[in-house]
Amino acid sequence: LDDDADAEEILKKVEEGLDELSLFTNLGARTITSGETEDKDWINNWKQYFKPFTVDHILIKPTWETVPEEHKDKLLVQIDPGTAFGTGMHETTQLCIRQIRKYTTPETTILDVGCGSGILGMLALKFGAKYSVGTDLDPCAIEATYENMEVNGISKEMYEVMIGNIIDDKDVQDKVGYGKYDIVVANILADVLVALTPVIVDQLKDGGIYITSGIIDDKEETVVEAVKAAGLEVLEVTYQGEWVSVTARKNG
């Protein structure tokens, strides 16, 4: 923060934001601490920890790194998340990647709820999907997705991104559209998935696939129950470390 920043006012806004978020998930004790620390380039400092890595036959690398010689035969995805979420390194993202790969066809239209950097929609297009739509609450997701799609050679005619809360914003729901998606993917917190699932059923085509993650293992049954309660058939539950992905189908 700048020297003249009003820390108390900022903390108040943080509390207000947490109040809003608590409508969708349990935030625990919500303890907030503040203090002074050394001034560093925090926006870019994290980049030293983001190195090229593989997910099965896919090489995911930051835009500022070169392709390792031993991985030049892999499907290449380049990512610069900026301030949006999504490098692909987290177990939940990798769980979603594998399920998207499994269910994507050349006719697939995919909706990515909470798209962040755009990595999941981008990979669906790399796997051969026809069109991708992403939604996010963070305005940074638009710029990050457009930049990442461009650096990966994906045409603007193949995707779109919109900002808004699809759970309770009818305008966003209408803009996204109903009954038009072969796949809906949501890599979000489990408690948000519980609220999202009954809404997202309307966006899926009959026979469409719903891929979820962001689920810690002790929340697995909560999400499975929400998926079943929405009338979806659970097809698979997959695991990586302590994280879970639930994949279901809308039968019509």
Task: For the regions a language model picked out, list residue spans one by one.
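S-adenosylmethionine
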Residues: L137-N251
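Conserved beta-strand segments of alpha/beta enzyme cores
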Residues: T31-T33, L59, Y131, M158-E160, ...
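A short, charged helix-loop
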Residues: D73-P81
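Short beta-strand element of the conserved SAM-dependent methyltransferase core
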Residues: L1, I79, V246-K250
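N-terminal auxiliary segments of SAM/dcSAM-dependent transferases
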Residues: L1-E70
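Conserved SAM/SAH cofactor-binding pocket of Class I
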Residues: T83-I166
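Hydrophobic residues in well-ordered beta-strands that form the structural core
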Residues: K61-P62, G134, T212
